[in-house]
Amino acid sequence: MEYDDMLDRAMEETPEIDGTSERFEVPDPDIRQEGNVTVYENFQSTCSRLGREDDHVMKFLQNDLGTSGHIDESGRVRLTGEFDATRIEASIDEYVDEFVLCSECGLPDTQLEREQGALLLRCEACGARSATSE
Protein backbone atom coordinates (compact mmCIF):
# COMPACT_ATOMS: atom_id res chain seq x y z
CA MET A 1 0.00 0.00 0.00
CA GLU A 2 1.34 3.41 -0.98
CA TYR A 3 1.88 6.12 1.60
CA ASP A 4 -0.73 8.42 0.02
CA ASP A 5 -3.29 5.61 0.06
CA MET A 6 -2.59 4.91 3.73
CA LEU A 7 -2.87 8.61 4.54
CA ASP A 8 -6.19 8.89 2.71
CA ARG A 9 -7.51 5.83 4.52
CA ALA A 10 -6.42 7.21 7.89
CA MET A 11 -8.12 10.54 7.19
CA GLU A 12 -11.34 8.77 6.22
CA GLU A 13 -11.36 6.70 9.41
CA THR A 14 -10.53 9.60 11.72
CA PRO A 15 -13.70 10.88 13.42
CA GLU A 16 -14.69 14.52 13.18
CA ILE A 17 -14.11 16.52 16.35
CA ASP A 18 -17.11 18.57 17.40
CA GLY A 19 -16.99 21.69 19.51
CA THR A 20 -14.42 24.39 19.89
CA SER A 21 -10.72 23.94 20.23
CA GLU A 22 -10.69 26.02 23.39
CA ARG A 23 -11.13 24.42 26.79
CA PHE A 24 -11.95 27.69 28.50
CA GLU A 25 -15.38 29.15 27.95
CA VAL A 26 -17.13 31.73 30.06
CA PRO A 27 -20.86 31.11 30.52
CA ASP A 28 -23.12 33.62 28.79
CA PRO A 29 -24.58 36.06 31.30
CA ASP A 30 -28.18 35.35 32.29
CA ILE A 31 -29.57 38.88 32.64
CA ARG A 32 -33.03 40.15 33.51
CA GLN A 33 -34.45 43.56 34.31
CA GLU A 34 -36.34 44.46 37.47
CA GLY A 35 -37.41 48.04 36.94
CA ASN A 36 -34.23 50.14 36.91
CA VAL A 37 -32.11 47.26 38.22
CA THR A 38 -30.23 44.69 36.14
CA VAL A 39 -30.00 41.26 37.77
CA TYR A 40 -27.10 39.02 36.75
CA GLU A 41 -28.53 35.61 37.62
CA ASN A 42 -25.55 33.32 36.94
CA PHE A 43 -22.85 35.54 38.43
CA GLN A 44 -21.66 32.85 40.85
CA SER A 45 -21.14 30.27 38.10
CA THR A 46 -19.25 32.85 36.04
CA CYS A 47 -16.92 33.64 38.95
CA SER A 48 -16.30 29.98 39.71
CA ARG A 49 -15.54 29.33 36.02
CA LEU A 50 -13.10 32.25 36.04
CA GLY A 51 -11.56 31.06 39.30
CA ARG A 52 -11.77 34.53 40.80
CA GLU A 53 -13.27 36.06 43.94
CA ASP A 54 -16.82 37.41 43.59
CA ASP A 55 -15.87 40.76 45.09
CA HIS A 56 -13.02 41.31 42.63
CA VAL A 57 -15.22 40.58 39.60
CA MET A 58 -18.02 42.71 41.06
CA LYS A 59 -15.68 45.66 41.63
CA PHE A 60 -14.49 45.43 38.02
CA LEU A 61 -18.07 45.29 36.70
CA GLN A 62 -19.05 48.34 38.72
CA ASN A 63 -16.06 50.34 37.49
CA ASP A 64 -16.42 49.23 33.88
CA LEU A 65 -20.17 49.85 33.72
CA GLY A 66 -20.00 53.04 35.77
CA THR A 67 -22.68 51.98 38.20
CA SER A 68 -23.23 50.72 41.70
CA GLY A 69 -24.48 47.33 42.73
CA HIS A 70 -24.28 44.54 45.24
CA ILE A 71 -24.32 40.77 45.51
CA ASP A 72 -27.59 39.61 47.06
CA GLU A 73 -28.15 36.68 49.43
CA SER A 74 -28.72 34.33 46.48
CA GLY A 75 -25.35 35.21 44.93
CA ARG A 76 -26.88 37.25 42.12
CA VAL A 77 -25.54 40.66 41.20
CA ARG A 78 -27.96 43.56 41.26
CA LEU A 79 -26.67 46.51 39.23
CA THR A 80 -28.31 49.92 39.27
CA GLY A 81 -29.35 50.80 35.72
CA GLU A 82 -30.39 48.91 32.64
CA PHE A 83 -27.67 46.85 30.95
CA ASP A 84 -28.24 44.23 28.28
CA ALA A 85 -26.50 40.86 28.17
CA THR A 86 -24.19 42.05 25.37
CA ARG A 87 -22.81 44.89 27.51
CA ILE A 88 -22.33 42.63 30.55
CA GLU A 89 -20.65 40.00 28.38
CA ALA A 90 -18.29 42.61 26.91
CA SER A 91 -17.35 43.71 30.42
CA ILE A 92 -16.71 40.12 31.52
CA ASP A 93 -14.59 39.58 28.39
CA GLU A 94 -12.50 42.62 29.35
CA TYR A 95 -12.08 41.17 32.84
CA VAL A 96 -10.95 37.84 31.38
CA ASP A 97 -8.38 39.56 29.15
CA GLU A 98 -7.00 41.61 32.04
CA PHE A 99 -7.22 39.26 35.04
CA VAL A 100 -7.57 35.66 33.81
CA LEU A 101 -5.72 34.91 30.56
CA CYS A 102 -1.92 34.84 30.56
CA SER A 103 -0.45 37.59 28.41
CA GLU A 104 2.37 35.28 27.28
CA CYS A 105 0.77 31.92 26.49
CA GLY A 106 -2.93 32.86 26.50
CA LEU A 107 -3.97 30.08 28.88
CA PRO A 108 -6.40 30.63 31.77
CA ASP A 109 -4.23 28.76 34.29
CA THR A 110 -3.42 31.87 36.30
CA GLN A 111 -3.57 33.14 39.85
CA LEU A 112 -3.73 36.69 41.14
CA GLU A 113 -1.13 37.57 43.75
CA ARG A 114 -0.05 40.75 45.49
CA GLU A 115 3.59 41.70 45.58
CA GLN A 116 4.71 44.96 47.16
CA GLY A 117 1.21 46.36 46.78
CA ALA A 118 0.92 45.52 43.07
CA LEU A 119 -1.53 42.94 41.77
CA LEU A 120 0.24 40.45 39.51
CA LEU A 121 -1.08 37.70 37.27
CA ARG A 122 1.04 34.55 37.66
CA CYS A 123 0.66 31.81 35.05
CA GLU A 124 0.89 28.27 36.36
CA ALA A 125 1.35 26.90 32.83
CA CYS A 126 4.33 28.91 31.57
CA GLY A 127 5.52 30.66 34.74
CA ALA A 128 5.09 34.17 33.35
CA ARG A 129 4.24 37.03 35.68
CA SER A 130 2.61 40.19 34.46
CA ALA A 131 1.25 43.33 36.05
CA THR A 132 -2.45 44.08 35.94
CA SER A 133 -4.09 47.48 35.65
CA GLU A 134 -5.14 47.38 39.31
Curated annotation (Swiss-Prot):
Biased composition (Basic and acidic residues): 1-12
Record carries keyword Signal: no
Pfam family, one: eIF-5_eIF-2B
Domain of life (superkingdom): Archaea
Molecular function as annotated in GO: translation initiation factor activity
Keywords: Initiation factor, Protein biosynthesis
Transmembrane segments: none
Segments of this protein annotated with the region Disordered: 1-28
Role of this protein: eIF-2 functions in the early steps of protein synthesis by forming a ternary complex with GTP and initiator tRNA.
UniProt-listed PANTHER family: EUKARYOTIC TRANSLATION INITIATION FACTOR (PTHR23001), EUKARYOTIC TRANSLATION INITIATION FACTOR 2 SUBUNIT 2 (PTHR23001:SF3)
Subunit-structure text: Heterotrimer composed of an alpha, a beta and a gamma chain.
Family: Belongs to the eIF-2-beta/eIF-5 family.
Protein name: Translation initiation factor 2 subunit beta
